[in-house]
Amino acid sequence: MPSLPNYLRSKRKQSSYSQEEVAFLLGLKGMDKGGKVSRDENYSRIPTLETALAYEAIYGKPIRELFAGLYEQIADEVSSRAKILSYRKSETRDSKRQQALSELALRHYKPVA
């Protein structure tokens, strides 16, 4: 799995929670609760949407901030696909759709330096 930054560990430490306390707040069960939190913090696994939303509730930060690296990767992929779709649909008469695709394609555009 690629190394993508997330901010779970720093937010947990700012909140003074232990991994076991976060695991309890997440509703994790089993012997390795703290280990599951550690794997999320180290990006050894991608948490479920339910778990990601629970992290948002615990730390009061949006998912896209807590998982910034993953968000940027996904946003770039969506932007690339929007460019392709926009090109494919360039001959369509639906200007609203074309405008929406163009905006999506440019939303996460990062010029190559």
Predicted features by range, described:
Residues 1-15, 106-113:
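A short, Lys/Arg-rich alpha-helix, primarily the initiator
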Residues 3-6, 16-17, 32, 47-50:
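Residue-level signal for the short linker/turn that defines the boundary of a DNA-recognition helix
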Residues 5-27, 79-91:
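Short basic helix-loop element that most often maps to the first helix and adjoining turn
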Residues 8, 19-23, 34-40, 66:
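Conserved hydrophobic/aromatic packing and binding residues within compact polymer-binding modules
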Residues 27-47:
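Recognition helix of helix-turn-helix/homeodomain-like DNA-binding domains
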Residues 48-65:
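DNA major-groove recognition helix of helix-turn-helix/homeodomain DNA-binding modules
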Residues 57, 67-113:
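Short, charged recognition helix plus adjacent turn
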